[in-house]
Design a protein with these regions (language model features):
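Beta-turn initiation residues at beta-strand->coil junctions
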Residues: 3-6, 25-29, 48-53, 72-77, ...
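Conserved anchor residues at repeat-unit boundaries in beta-strand-based tandem repeats, strongest
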Residues: 10-21, 33-44, 57-68, 84-97, ...
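Surface-exposed loop/turn motifs in large extracellular/passenger domains
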Residues: 78-83
Length: 166
C-alpha cells in the first residue's frame, strides 16, 4: 500500500490496523529515506536510513524511531573532508556499549566502550603516531598509558593518570 501525505512525503509498504507494520519504505520531508521494519507507525527492527542533510547512512537495529542495539553509521563532513564510521552498540539514538569509531583520512581509531555518544569506560585510541589506552570518561582519557610509536616497531610507554603524565 502507498500513502502520500500533504507534505509530499510518502510511505509504501505493509499496513496493519491502519498503521505501518512490517516491511516498508518512506521518504520524509527532510529528504531522509528509510527502508526496513516498522511497528505501530514507528521505525522498529532492522532498517537502513539515508540522511539527506547529514551526509550519512545508518544500517542496523531500531526501537521506537531510535537507533538501538547493533548498527553501523557512516557520515562525512564535506567542509573538513573527513569520513566518520561507527560500528557497534546503540541505545536511545546514542553510541552506547562496545564499539569501534574511525575517523579518516587521519586514521584515528577508537575501540572500546561508549556511553551516551562519548568514549566512556575501557578503550584504546590509535593514531598514526601513538595510542592511548585506559579508562575514559565523557570522551577524555582519565587513567592509562600513552604509547608513542617511532619509525621502527619499537615504542615508548608513558603512564597517564588524571591528566598527568608519569
Amino acid at each position: 500500500m502507498k500513502i502520500v501525505y500533504s507534505d509530499n512525503s510518502f510511505y509504501e509498504g505493509q499496513m496493519k490496523n491502519n498503521k505501518k507494520n512490517g516491511e516498508g519504505y518512506a521518504e520524509f520531508p527532510s529528504g531522509n529515506i528509510y527502508q526496513g521494519e516498522w511497528k505501530n507507525n514507528n521505525v522498529d527492527g532492522f532498517g537502513k536510513v539515508i540522511y539527506a542533510n547529514k551526509y550519512g547512512v545508518y544500517e542496523g537495529n531500531w526501537k521506537n524511531n531510535k537507533k538501538h542495539d547493533y548498527g553501523k553509521m557512516i557520515w562525512t563532513s564535506t567542509v573538513l573532508s573527513k569520513k566518520h564510521t561507527y560500528i557497534g552498540s546503540w541505545e536511545n539514538d546514542y553510541m552506547h556499549g562496545n564499539g569501534k569509531y574511525i575517523i579518516e583520512p587521519q586514521k584515528y581509531i577508537y575501540v572500546g566502550e561508549f556511553k551516551n555518544g562519548l568514549e566512556d569506560g575501557y578503550g584504546i585510541l590509535y593514531t598514526q603516531d601513538c595510542s592511548f589506552e585506559g579508562i575514559w570518561e565523557s570522551g577524555r582519557l582519565q587513567k592509562g598509558r600513552i604509547k608513542k610509536y617511532r619509525r621502527s616497531p619499537r615504542f615508548k610507554k608513558i603512564n597517564y593518570h588524571s591528566n598527568t603524565l608519569k
